[in-house]
């Protein structure tokens, strides 16, 4: 976003001084057309060890953003983990969903809540989530070993099954929600399940690389199967599973 058309500021949404800090940056009184709230802590496993951090950022931080800025349309990035609420991460995001829904309805503000499902894909930028599948595969390609967490699940090959989406598909959905708010929760997935073991082999094939796979115990909070059943009209399938795993750059 750093360029002639954008201004970028670094703020802590959970800081008690956030309302003061952000008003110092945005000193004008006009409303924003849309706020897209993407800031969050997202590591499922880590949330089981540091739940307070996740509730502070994902719940209190969301409340700060909601109540500090003026806007006509609010978009919340949530997660499929909010459905099962099997981890502090999932619970914190579900709480954020409810806060956004109730606040926007009370204030008569347009809103959309998007639950993302396993976003992957690359456009030449290093993945920001070091524990995500794509980042882990890129690291394995460089270092020689991929760590597979759990291979004893009740699935076709023992590894977790997920519904994968491309980051550009998610961006397209966000743009649609700017233009036409849903005023409800929408799930962003394709309803197609692919196992982690299958994704490993696809990554090796499309990127012409090889590495070892070392099995580790399953991580706390990981769902065995997470595949979407109800497909949102905001979601358009634009990439094949091979394209999802293609490393650019």
Model regions and ranges:
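Residues in well-ordered alpha-helical elements
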Residues: 26, 45, 52, 63, ...
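NAD(P)-dependent short-chain dehydrogenase/reductase
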Residues: 88, 101-176, 200-204
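Conserved C-terminal active-site "lid" loop/helix of NAD(P)H-dependent oxidoreductases
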Residues: 167, 216-243
